[in-house]
């Protein structure tokens, strides 16, 4: 498994993974626009040329928000999500970012478990944040060691 910075060659595969994993997926154009955003950091997990996972964030000053993460269903429970987030955190620390926030569906116990294992804590709740279906989101945050 390789963990690489996202480039143009990954956009279509990420868009397909979005469609596979989410009811309200990002378009290929939206994903591609992140390549030109200096505040964005996106990484992919590639296995034998296939994009099997990705993570993306945007940072402002010393904080960042994880915009999206997904792992192909055939590759789940293999540590890929964990490794992608670790790679993202390494890149953010290099930019002097000291914290990472994210939103997660309150029903997504698997993701909440992963984030908690990685040191994220619930710091708030956004009522009705998600649609398709409508659901609340937990806001989770991780502070990085300096």
Language-model region placement:
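Conserved catalytic-core motifs of GNAT/GCN5-like acyltransferases
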Residues: 103, 116, 121-137
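Terminal substrate-recognition subdomain of acyl/acetyltransferases
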Residues: 136-146
């Amino acid at each position: 498994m390789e963990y690489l910075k996202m480039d143009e060659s990954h956009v279509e595969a990420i868009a397909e993974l979005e469609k596979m994993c989410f009811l309200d997926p990002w378009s290929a154009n939206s994903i591609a626009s992140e390549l030109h955003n200096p505040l964005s950091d996106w990484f992919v997990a590639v296995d034998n040329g296939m994009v099997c996972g990705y993570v993306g964030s945007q940072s402002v000053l010393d904080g960042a928000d994880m915009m999206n993460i997904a792992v192909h269903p055939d590759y789940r429970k293999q540590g890929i999500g964990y490794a992608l987030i670790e790679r993202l955190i390494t890149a953010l620390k290099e930019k002097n970012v000291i914290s990472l926030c994210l939103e997660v569906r309150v029903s997504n116990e698997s993701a909440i478990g992963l984030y908690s294992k990685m040191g994220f804590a619930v710091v708030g709740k956004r009522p009705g944040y998600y649609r398709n279906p409508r659901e609340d989101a937990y806001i989770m945050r991780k502070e990085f060691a300096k």
